[in-house]
C-alpha cells in the first residue's frame, strides 16, 4: 500500500459512474492511484456554474445553464475542454482516466479529442471502455496497475 500523499493524483472523466461502474475507481485506488476529481456527468460539470439569478427571465437562465454544461452530446463542446483544463491545474492532476460505457457513442467519439487535449498538456491518459457488469474486473486491475506503475 502506498501512502496517500505519494499516490498519483487521478482525474476521472467521461460517462456517469455509479453502481458497478464504480469498479473503475476502485481499481485505480486499489492499484496505487488517488482519484481526486470527477469531471463526468455525475461530477464537477453538473455543479460547476451557478444559474444567473439576476435576470428578468429565470426560465431562460435555467435553460442557458443546462445547455452550457460541457457534455459530449453538445456540439461544439468547448465548455467541457475549458472545465477539464481548469480542473487539471486546480487539482494538480498527474494523469487522466476516461471511462466510456459501452454504447455511449458520443463519449466514445469525443475520447479522441480528450486524449489529444490531455496529452497536449503533457499528462498521461488512459481510456477504459466498460459496462455495468463485473466481468472485466481482472482486465481493469491489470490495465490500471500498469498505467499507475508508469506514472
Residue ranges and their predicted role:
Residues 2-5, 63-65, 92-95:
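A short alpha-helix capping/helix-coil boundary motif
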Residues 81-151:
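TerminUS-proximal long segments
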Residues 1-7, 17-18:
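Electropositive, gly/pro-rich neighborhoods at or near active sites that engage anionic ligands
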Residues 8-9, 25:
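Small-residue-enriched flexible segments
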Amino acid at each position: 500500500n502506498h501512502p496517500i500523499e505519494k499516490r498519483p493524483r487521478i482525474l476521472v472523466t467521461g460517462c456517469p459512474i455509479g453502481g458497478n461502474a464504480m469498479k473503475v475507481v476502485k481499481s485505480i485506488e486499489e492499484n496505487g492511484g488517488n482519484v481526486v476529481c470527477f469531471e463526468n456527468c455525475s461530477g464537477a460539470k453538473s455543479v460547476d456554474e451557478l444559474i444567473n439569478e439576476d435576470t428578468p427571465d429565470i426560465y431562460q437562465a435555467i435553460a442557458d445553464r443546462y445547455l452550457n454544461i460541457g457534455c459530449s452530446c453538445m456540439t461544439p463542446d468547448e465548455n467541457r475542454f475549458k472545465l477539464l483544463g481548469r480542473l487539471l491545474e486546480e487539482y494538480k492532476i498527474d494523469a487522466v482516466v476516461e471511462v466510456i460505457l459501452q454504447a455511449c457513442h458520443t463519449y466514445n467519439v469525443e475520447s479522441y479529442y480528450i486524449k489529444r487535449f490531455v496529452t497536449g498538456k503533457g499528462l498521461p491518459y488512459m481510456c477504459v471502455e466498460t459496462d455495468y457488469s463485473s466481468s472485466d474486473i481482472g482486465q481493469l486491475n491489470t490495465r490500471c496497475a500498469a498505467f499507475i506503475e508508469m506514472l
